[in-house]
C-alpha cells in the first residue's frame, strides 16, 4: 500500500500531530512535478520506500500535512487515477475543505475513493481545544454532511476518533453525535494515539495508557459496538489489554510491521498471531506492565480468513 504525502503544511495545530513543526517547511517538495516523479518511480518499481504495507500493492494512502491544501490537489488525484485506475485512494484529511459545496461536488467525481476525517470532540469547545483552530468544528460538521450528500457509488466515509488525554472522557458523547447526525457513515474507527512528535511535545495534555482507556471506556465500546455493528472498529489495541472478548471482533491491525513492537510477555503468548501489536514508542512512555501472555484462543474464536492480515478475529464463540 503506497503512502504518499501531497502537502506538508496544515492549518490545524493538533496537540498530538504525528508530524514535526519542521516538516511543514518542506512545501517546495510538493509541487505537481515533484509528486508526479514519485508516482512514476513507484510505477516503474523504484518507489519501495513509499510502501506502508509492502504486502498490499495497489491501494494508495494519501496524507500530509493537509493534502487538500495543495493547489494541484485535483490534478494529482486525476493523475493517480489515470495511472492506477483500479486502486482505492484512501484520503486522510481534517475535512475543512469539504465544507465548500463546490469542492465536495468535485470530489464526488473521483471513483473508488475512501475519505477519513477525524472527530476530536463532541462540540466546538472540545474539538477546537485539540486542533487549535477556530471554527474547525463547524467546518468539519458541514464537511461531513457534504461528503454524505454528494458521495457516489464506490465512495465511502470513515470518521476517526483519536483517543488522547483531552478527549478520553467524551467518547460516549462523540459516538452519540455521529449516530444522531451522521447515521449513514460507512465506518467509525477509534484509534489509540501514537506517541510521536507533537504528542510527545505536549505530553502533559496528551498522555494516557491502554489501561486508562479501557477502564473508562470498555462499557462505552461495548454499547456503541452493538449499535454500530461491523462499522465500529478499534485500532492500535493489543489483544491482552482488551479484557472483554466481545470487543475482539472490532479490533483491526492498521500499523505496518516496522511500527510495531512486542514486549517480553509477548514472546510467550500463545495467541500472538491474532494480536494487533504495540506501537513502537508506547512502552517508552508507559512501560510494559500492562501486557501479559494469553493462552491459545484459537478454539474460542473464528478467524477472518478473507482478511486475516488486517482483521484477525471475525467472531468470538
Regions found by a protein language model. Give the residues of each.
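Structural recognition of alpha->loop->beta junctions
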Residues: 104-120, 176-189, 251-270
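N-terminal pre-triad scaffold of radical SAM enzymes
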Residues: 1-20, 47-62, 68
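Canonical radical SAM enzyme core domain
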Residues: 24-44, 67-112, 118-125, 133-139, ...
Amino acid at each position: 500500500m503506497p503512502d504518499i504525502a501531497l502537502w506538508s503544511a496544515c492549518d490545524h495545530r493538533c496537540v498530538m500531530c504525528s508530524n514535526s513543526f519542521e516538516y511543514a517547511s518542506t512545501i517546495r517538495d510538493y509541487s505537481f512535478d515533484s509528486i508526479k516523479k514519485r508516482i512514476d518511480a513507484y510505477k516503474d518499481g523504484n518507489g519501495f520506500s513509499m510502501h506502508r504495507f509492502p504486502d498490499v500493492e495497489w491501494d494508495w494512502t494519501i496524507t500530509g500535512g493537509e493534502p487538500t491544501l495543495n493547489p494541484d490537489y485535483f490534478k494529482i488525484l486525476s493523475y493517480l487515477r489515470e495511472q492506477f485506475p483500479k486502486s482505492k485512494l484512501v484520503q486522510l484529511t481534517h475535512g475543512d475543505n469539504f465544507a465548500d459545496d463546490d469542492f465536495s461536488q468535485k470530489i464526488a467525481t473521483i471513483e473508488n475513493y475512501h475519505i477519513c476525517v477525524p472527530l476530536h470532540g463532541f462540540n466546538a469547545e472540545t474539538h477546537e481545544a485539540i486542533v487549535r483552530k477556530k471554527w474547525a468544528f463547524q467546518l468539519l460538521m458541514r464537511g461531513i454532511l457534504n461528503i454524505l450528500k454528494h458521495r457516489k457509488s464506490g465512495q465511502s466515509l470513515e470518521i476517526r476518533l483519536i483517543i488522547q488525554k483531552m478527549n478520553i472522557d467524551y467518547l460516549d458523547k462523540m459516538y452519540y453525535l455521529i449516530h444522531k447526525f451522521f447515521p449513514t457513515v460507512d465506518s467509525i474507527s477509534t484509534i489509540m494515539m501514537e506517541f510521536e512528535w507533537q504528542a510527545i511535545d505536549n505530553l502533559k495534555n496528551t498522555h494516557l495508557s491502554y489501561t486508562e482507556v479501557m477502564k473508562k471506556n470498555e462499557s462505552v465500546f461495548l454499547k456503541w459496538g452493538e449499535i454500530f455493528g461491523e462499522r465500529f472498529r478499534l485500532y492500535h489495541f493489543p489483544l491482552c489489554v482488551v479484557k472483554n472478548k466481545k470487543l475482539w471482533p472490532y479490533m483491526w491491525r492498521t500499523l505496518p510491521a516496522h511500527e510495531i513492537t512486542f514486549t517480553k510477555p509477548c514472546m510467550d503468548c500463545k495467541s500472538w498471531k491474532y494480536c494487533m501489536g504495540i506501537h513502537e514508542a508506547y512502552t517508552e512512555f508507559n512501560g510494559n506492565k500492562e501486557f501479559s501472555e494469553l493462552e491459545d484462543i484459537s478454539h474460542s474464536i473464528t478467524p477472518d480468513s478473507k482478511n486475516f492480515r488486517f482483521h484477525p478475529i471475525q467472531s468470538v464463540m
